[in-house]
């Protein structure tokens, strides 16, 4: 039932029975499929058997499937989703008023769960397939800690062991998030650690390093492959993660259709691409099939600008070069970004699905500096009453910028962005901003060249 003429409420909640029953696989509608993952030793496309050494078998199948458009969500996962979904689609009336813009601003809020973000959507799926396979546990990496928290929640629910390698600078900046993980039974180690061979190697090569997501991934993969009954799971980048995250985009699309809302532009922050891919996929599918047109904008930190300044090439997904090679926009897997305050976006590469779509001109990208991001975060907090995560605030920055352009031109554009989570554990970052101690670090071309020159040569 379309209620196009009805007054649009501040928050649109779908009914429980309107929860998506299937995930949407955007690769099925892509003419140019993402390039395959390659075996790091042979440079040949990874087989199901090879991927199954690292990932759960069912997840490895999802990773390789670029033809099935819809994949059924198991009932057990739907039951878990019901604890915190459907998530609201919010009309930012208060922000619109404060900006004095004719634009209509909407955001999909994914912070309604203890992990504080969208990450739980894929954590429960990956933990479910691990449990179904009869595994003892899983290993993973986490940056700011949202993914680690989400996975520890899912593992606690299903009775699985959970081993988390947390990027050292976040481990130190965000002790409370570490404790939430431990409350859910996870074992949390700062990365790089002395528990793995790759951790020892990185510590020796970069003494005193604050770590990176790429480095934590290497440790988690090594830990999984050297312990019987364990597999590695991860919170972003891979196609399987973007697939699970489409639950958010599908809900958003249903809510929009229900109220006759047609977004002109859809904006999301992008680190590895899980939130952006999940939010835009169902809309991107329409664009790929020629049924509708939307403007898609990926927003990344200026300190880690993979889409806007990276190269499109095969690269390692991790610093230790143990993961498969992925063709993506990358700064080079040895690139260690400055210890900026959006830990969840400090990744050198980008999902191969989003990289392909960006390469083919279906979406655009912008990089923003962190002081401008926190200015947008505070404006949003003061008008909309939600304290946003630093990661999400990258999308808020561009949404506000676009709304202000509408104010100048008088256009009544409909702007939709993903509010991926809350910022309650990011108070060190907010404190730095409030104390005027936050700086904007932008890597030089020379610095980027160093890590790009060290990338693998793949014919």
Annotated model-derived regions:
Residues 125-135, 149-161, 182-183, 280-290, ...:
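Alpha-helix C-terminal capping segments
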Residues 122, 130-169, 262-276, 296, ...:
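A short, small-residue-rich loop immediately preceding and capping a beta-strand
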Residues 139, 147-210, 306-316, 427-435:
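Active-site-proximal loop->helix
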Residues 270-278, 370-436:
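Claisen-condensing/thiolase-fold acyl-transfer catalytic domains that form or cleave C-C bonds
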Residues 70-72, 202-240, 248, 260, ...:
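Active-site/ligand-binding loops adjacent to catalytic centers
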Residues 5-135:
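Positively charged, low-complexity intrinsically disordered leader regions
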Residues 109-120, 138-147, 238, 267-272, ...:
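Active-site nucleophile and cofactor-binding loops and adjacent substrate-binding regions
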């Amino acid at each position: 039932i379309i209620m196009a003429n009805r007054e649009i409420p501040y928050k649109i909640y779908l009914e429980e029975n309107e929860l998506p029953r299937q995930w949407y696989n955007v690769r099925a509608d892509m003419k140019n499929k993402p390039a395959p993952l390659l075996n790091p030793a042979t440079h040949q496309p990874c087989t199901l058997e090879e991927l199954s050494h690292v990932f759960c078998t069912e997840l490895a199948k999802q990773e390789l499937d670029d033809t099935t458009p819809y994949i059924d969500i198991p009932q057990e996962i739907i039951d878990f989703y019901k604890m915190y979904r459907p998530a609201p689609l919010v009309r930012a009336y208060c922000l619109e008023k404060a900006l004095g813009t004719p634009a209509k601003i909407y955001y999909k809020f994914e912070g309604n769960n203890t992990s504080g973000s969208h990450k739980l959507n894929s954590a429960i799926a990956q933990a479910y397939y691990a449990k179904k396979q009869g595994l003892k546990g899983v290993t993973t990496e986490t940056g700011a800690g949202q993914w680690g928290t989400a996975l520890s929640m899912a593992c606690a629910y299903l009775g699985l062991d959970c081993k988390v390698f947390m990027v050292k600078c976040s481990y130190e900046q965000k002790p409370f998030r570490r404790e939430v993980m431990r409350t859910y039974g996870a074992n949390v180690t700062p990365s790089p650690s002395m528990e793995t061979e790759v951790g020892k190697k990185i510590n020796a090569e970069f003494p005193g390093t604050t770590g990176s997501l790429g480095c934590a991934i290497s440790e988690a993969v090594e830990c999984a492959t050297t312990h019987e009954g364990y597999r590695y799971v991860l919170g972003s980048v891979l196609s399987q993660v973007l697939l699970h995250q489409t639950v958010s985009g599908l809900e958003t699309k249903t809510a929009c259709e229900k109220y006759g809302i047609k977004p002109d532009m859809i904006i999301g922050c992008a680190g590895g691409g899980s939130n952006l891919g999940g939010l835009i996929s169902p809309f991107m599918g329409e664009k790929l099939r020629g049924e509708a047109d939307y403007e898609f904008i990926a927003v990344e930190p200026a300190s880690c600008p993979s889409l806007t300044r990276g190269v499109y090439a095969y690269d390692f997904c991790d610093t230790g070069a143990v993961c498969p090679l992925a063709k993506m926009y990358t700064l080079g897997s040895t690139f260690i970004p400055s210890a900026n305050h959006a830990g969840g976006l400090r990744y050198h590469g980008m999902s191969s699905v989003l990289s392909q779509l960006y390469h083919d001109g279906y979406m655009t990208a912008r990089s923003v500096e962190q002081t401008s991001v926190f200015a947008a975060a505070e404006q949003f907090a003061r008008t909309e009453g939600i304290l946003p995560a630093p990661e999400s605030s990258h999308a808020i920055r561009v949404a506000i910028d676009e709304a202000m352009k509408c104010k100048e031109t008088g256009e009544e554009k409909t702007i939709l962005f993903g509010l991926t989570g809350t910022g309650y554990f990011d108070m060190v970052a907010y404190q730095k901003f409030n104390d005027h101690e936050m700086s904007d670090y932008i890597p030089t071309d020379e610095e980027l060249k160093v890590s790009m020159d060290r990338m693998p040569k793949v014919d």
